[in-house]
Regions:
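Membrane-proximal periplasmic segments of bacterial cell-envelope enzymes
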Residues: 1-216, 223-224, 249-255, 261, ...
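N-terminal leader/targeting segments and the immediately adjacent pre-domain N-terminus
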Residues: 16, 227-247, 270-272, 690-693, ...
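Solvent-exposed, polar/charged alpha-helical surfaces in well-ordered, non-transmembrane soluble domains
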Residues: 55, 64, 83, 87-90, ...
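Conserved serine DD-peptidase/penicillin-binding transpeptidase domain
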Residues: 137, 172-195, 199, 223, ...
Length: 701
């Protein structure tokens, strides 16, 4: 009879029951000669990831494996053990799909070295399989419970939440002290990875006491597993799902971002297509992961924060604000805006062949007049408007906890000299002034810029995480909604730009009428650009802005990726998606943007929202130390940082293309930085005579 491993350990005290029913305090057990103990770890459940209202984005469930429970045999030679185990495998195959494959040596060595631990023979059981087997497994088979990660909303916010996976396969061979009883989980992507330490709990401990003949004397849980902390995001799950639904109906590939201007909180960051996070539980096969990578729609790639695209005409408000702030133009300055202008040997066109005539800045924004912006961009100069763009967050990652976030690109003379072998020329300036050329930004950056213009004087510091809480609900870290980067621009200049953006949607001849709302004035800017290799003839469309006009509260950006040879425009494709989103939320938006009422002191009962938190595990089988039910519960979120009152200003109280900058698709065997880097698309074609990028006339409405 094989004996247990010869490991020495102090015999624990405390209430426990021996295999034959004796107490742990029974002196006979303590006095057994050559008795040995083995300590095992009980992996703790990960803490939940929640939306701002306490809705779970990631939590845990109890899943079950089918396992062989060897027990102690009177006669235990190799042939007998292998034959007995084979019969258990045959029985298991009758009830579940995908029973694991074992060699005779595997079956024998598990009995020889670790028969006191179950041998898992299946993946997670399906609900139907579990119900069929519950209480009917037969001799030698057991249902073995483990904690499994669960993503209740499937693909919702998949690029932000990320996914988790097993740290490694369970060990084989002789048992070592402090081995995990089942596979431990670690974050592999997104918040799951970036907040892995906060989400991980503290393992529990179990000790097994054996006699010299290998029979189990005592099984004792000495420490219960302690669940991980709670990560509360700024996302609004209802809004996130609505945005994803709008994208699903409106495009095959695109992105939708919404930011609370008052706090900088990211409420929505949707990318289409996404992927079901539950496909990664408990793990994903190499074949399935490769299929996701090879999918031409690139579901693992977040267009919202990893994609770098020319912002096109959605960038024009930045140029207008820079020119107004510098005094290059005033609200009343009229500039003749023909159908095209000539710079050197090149002609730069408007999107329409009809001259706009002498127009002011508000009309230029409303009509998205390229020739007005060519001229004004050159007058104010690239240093001024590109400098303001950087202040508004273009050209740098936002700093949010996002893996593979693009920095975009705002060129400098140094960058141009290094990469294009020239300084920024007038032709480059003309292209940049309409958001094209080498200028690149993500939808998240465009929405952030709109938040700054909507605010008028400052750029809110973006937030994606509201709080990280410990198991007891104590706040480990919390966002600071008061943090802002001051722009140093004339508030009146920003007001003029906002008026022009209002006319885009609500004025005569505006290019964004498709986004007009029934209950408030929305300010926006359309944008359309060529994108990708010229051979694909592919365009993308933008609609970005904020609402309401008189006291902006929400900034947004929507990106529509067109198919090759498809005619698209921001006014026709992206603007209607914005309308659909905000009209659906009409009552909620109206309430949140309503002017604050006179304060009235009242005494009322606490009706604070509930935030789902991980609580200490109570439902543990005392015999095994394994979970019997999810260790989750609810508790009032009395310590959440409140948002500012509705309506209250917190400060008062060429050929154009996009490079997939820093594109990251996370894979199970990714390198240390967790990223896979793809080759960029073909370089931009340049004019052989002057090497100046040209802006192609792209229709706006």
């Amino acid at each position: 009879m094989p004996a247990p491993p010869t490991v020495a350990s102090e015999i624990p005290s405390g209430a426990a029951v021996a295999a034959d029913g004796r107490s742990a305090n029974d002196a006979k057990i303590f006095n057994r000669p050559n008795a040995r103990t083995i300590a095992s770890l009980i992996p703790a459940p990960r803490g939940p990831i929640l939306d701002r209202e306490g809705e779970p984005l990631a939590n845990n469930r109890v899943a079950y494996h089918l396992a062989i429970n060897y027990g102690q045999f009177e006669v235990a030679d190799r042939d007998f053990v292998v034959s007995w185990a084979r019969k258990r495998l045959e029985e298991a195959a009758k009830h579940v799909q995908g029973v694991l494959t074992f060699t005779d040596e595997d079956l024998w060595l598990h009995y020889r070295h670790r028969r006191w631990l179950p041998l898992i023979v299946s993946g997670f059981l399906k609900d139907a399989e579990f119900k069929k087997l519950e209480g009917k497994t037969g001799v030698g088979l057991i249902l073995f419970p483990v904690y499994a990660r669960n993503y209740p909303e499937g693909a919702a916010a998949s690029h932000i939440i990320g996914y988790s996976g097993s740290i490694g396969k369970l060990p084989t061979g002789p048992i070592n002290q402090n081995e995990p009883m089942f596979e431990e989980i670690e974050g592999r992507a997104g918040i799951e990875k970036l907040f892995d330490q906060a989400l991980r709990g503290v393992p529990g401990r179990k000790r097994l006491l054996f006699d010299s003949d290998g029979s189990k004397l005592l099984e004792e849980q000495t420490l219960r597993p302690r669940p991980g902390g709670t990560v509360v995001t700024t996302l609004n799950l209802r809004w996130q799902k609505l945005a994803e639904s709008v994208l699903e109906k409106g495009c095959e590939r695109g992105a939708f971002v919404v930011i609370d201007i008052a706090t900088g909180e990211v409420l929505v960051m949707a990318s289409r297509p996404g992927f079901d996070l539950n496909r990664f539980v408990p793990g994903i096969s190499n074949e399935a992961f490769q299929a996701l990578q090879d999918d031409p729609s690139r579901p693992l790639f977040s267009r919202a924060f990893q994609g770098a695209y020319p912002p096109a005409s959605s960038f024009k408000p930045v140029v207008a604000l820079a020119a107004l702030n510098a005094g290059t133009v005033s609200e009343d300055t009229l500039i003749d805006s023909p159908a095209s202008i000539t710079l050197g040997n090149h002609t730069f066109h408007n999107w329409t062949k009809v001259p706009e005539g002498a127009i002011n800045v508000k009309r230029a924004i409303a009509r998205s007049c390229n020739t007005w912006f060519y001229q004004v961009g050159i007058r104010v100069g690239p240093t001024a408007f590109l400098g303001l763009a950087r202040q508004l967050g273009f050209g740098a990652a936002t700093g949010l906890p996002l893996i593979g976030e693009t920095a975009g690109l705002v060129p400098t003379n140094e960058w141009m000299l290094k990469n294009e072998r020239r300084r920024i020329l007038d032709g480059d300036t003309a292209n940049l002034s309409i958001g094209q050329g080498v200028l690149l930004a993500s939808p998240l950056q465009v929405a952030q810029g709109m938040a700054g213009i909507g605010h008028g004087t400052a750029l809110p510091k973006l937030q994606l995480i509201r709080q990280v809480q410990n198991i007891n609900g104590g706040v480990i870290s919390a966002a600071d909604p008061e943090r802002k980067n001051w722009l140093g621009v004339d508030p009146q200049a920003a007001q003029v730009v906002r008026a022009g953006m209002r006319d885009v949607v609500n004025g005569g001849g505006g290019t964004g009428h498709g986004a007009s709302l029934s209950y408030t004035e929305l300010c926006g800017k359309t944008g359309t650009a060529q994108w990708g290799p010229p051979s694909k003839n592919q365009r993308l469309a933008w609609f970005a802005g904020f609402l309401p006009y008189d006291n902006p509260r929400y900034a947004f950006a929507v990106l529509y990726e067109g198919k090759p040879n498809q005619t698209v425009s921001g006014g026709r494709m992206a603007a209607p998606m914005v309308k659909s989103f905000f009209e659906t939320l009409k009552d909620e938006i109206k309430e949140s943007i309503a002017p604050p009422k006179r304060a009235v002191v009242v005494i009322a009962e606490d009706d604070s929202r509930e935030i789902l938190r991980a609580l200490p595990v109570e439902d543990i089988d005392p015999a095994t130390g394994l979970p019997q039910a999810p260790a989750l519960d609810t508790a009032p979120a009395t310590d959440l940082i409140p948002a500012p009152p509705a309506g209250q200003d917190p400060d008062e109280g060429g050929v154009i293309r996009a490079l997939p900058v820093n594109e990251a698709e996370i894979r199970p065997d990714a390198p240390a930085d967790g990223l896979l880097h793809e080759r960029p698309v073909a370089p931009v074609q340049t004019d052989p005579d002057e090497d100046v990028r040209r802006a192609l006339p792209v229709e706006e409405p």
